[in-house]
């Protein structure tokens, strides 16, 4: 019984991933077709550029998570920063 439940859950997860991937491909094809026809080309390019910028920004924020920030790191209290050693 447990095996059946686990297999059902795994297959549902895999199916969801597959559907997401095919939806992304379909969306890209639709955009390309739309751009190729020339209808609203600048608007569509602008939308694609905004999506790319948002994706790049999110990736940059993920990379910055462990690095130093304005007053120390996220894991370090501000008062332990070197700026406050003389206080």
Swiss-Prot record:
Q: Which UniProt keywords apply?
A: Developmental protein, Signal
Q: Which positions carry the signal peptide feature in this UniProt record?
A: 1-16
UniProt entry tagged with the keyword Signal: yes
Q: Is Signal given among the entry's keywords?
A: yes
Entry protein name: Developmentally-regulated ectodermal protein
**Organism, as annotated:** Tripneustes gratilla (Hawaian sea urchin)
The root-end lineage is:
Eukaryota, Metazoa, Echinodermata, Eleutherozoa, Echinozoa
């Amino acid at each position: 019984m447990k095996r059946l439940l686990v297999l059902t859950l795994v297959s549902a997860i895999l199916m969801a991933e597959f559907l997401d991937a095919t939806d992304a491909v379909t969306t890209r094809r639709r955009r390309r077709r739309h751009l190729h026809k020339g209808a609203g080309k600048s608007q569509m390019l602008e939308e694609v550029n905004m999506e790319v910028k948002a994706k790049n920004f999110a990736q940059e924020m993920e990379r910055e998570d462990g690095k130093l920030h304005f007053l120390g790191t996220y894991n370090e209290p501000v008062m332990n920063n070197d700026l406050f050693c003389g206080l």
